[in-house]
Amino acid sequence: MPKNKGKGGKNRRRGKNENESEKRELVFKEDGQEYAQVIKMLGNGRLEALCFDGVKRLCHIRGKLRKKVWINTSDIILVGLRDYQDNKADVILKYNADEARSLKAYGELPEHAKINETDTFGPGDDDEVQFDDIGDDDEDIDDI
C-alpha cells in the first residue's frame, strides 16, 4: 500500500474564511425574537440560554451557524422564539463583544447583562487566598 504523501484534503485547498475583520451592520430584534445570554452548552447543537425577558430556554443552533460560528457560554445571541413551544428557541445570530456593547449602549440589552465577563466562580475577590503556616521551613531543611 502506498504512503500518504499529500498535505490534506479539499478543506486545505479552500483555505480559511477570514471575515472577522469586516464590520457588519448591527441587527436589532424584531417581533418573535429575543436577546439572550448563553448559560450552558449542552452539545449536539443545543444550548441553554437565559433570555432577557426572564425565561430560561433550550436553544437549537441552526445549520447555517453550526460549524462556522463558535458559541461559548456568556455570549450574547439573538434567538427566534417558537409560536408553539415557549420553552424552546432557535439561535439566529451571535453578537461579538463590540456589537453587544453597542446594543447595551442603545438600551436594547438590560444593564445587568454581563458582556465578555466569564466569571464562573461568582462574586468575590480572587486576591484573598489564605495560606496556613504549618511550621518554620528553615527547621525542616536543616533536619534533612
Curated annotation (Swiss-Prot):
Organism field: Pan troglodytes (Chimpanzee)
SMART domains: eIF1a
Pfam families: eIF-1a
Gene: EIF1AY
Tissue: Ubiquitous.
Cross-referenced Gene3D superfamilies: Nucleic acid-binding proteins
Residue stretches of biased makeup (Acidic residues): 124-144
Subcellular localization: Cytoplasm
Protein name per UniProt: Eukaryotic translation initiation factor 1A, Y-chromosomal
